[in-house]
A protein has these predicted regions:
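N-terminal/domain-start alpha-helical segments
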Residues: 1-87
């Protein structure tokens, strides 16, 4: 299984990468919207997406990546406002 990790926090991105690789998954990393557009393709089976990227909204990015293939996603956010979490 190939998992795309789109997270701007280096420490969290590396922790997710290490944990998933230790469990046998293949990962593709991106630290920004721009990197995700460049690195993530339709070969991924799951996306882990930070909602608050420095160069764009993670939800809009996810919708853009969905154009060629429907990919399930887990969204991450550091925001604790209920409105943001329900988004």
């Amino acid at each position: 299984m190939r998992i795309g990790i789109i997270e701007d926090d280096n420490l969290l991105r590396k922790a997710l990468d290490t944990s998933l690789k230790n469990q046998g998954y293949t990962t593709i990393l991106a630290g920004s919207r721009k990197e995700a557009i460049k690195n993530i393709d339709s070969s991924v089976d799951l996306l882990i997406v930070d909602i608050g990227l420095p160069d764009g909204d993670g939800i809009n990015l996810y919708q853009e990546l969905q154009k060629n293939k429907k990919i399930p996603a887990i969204f991450l956010t550091a925001k604790d406002d209920e409105k943001d979490m329900l988004k």
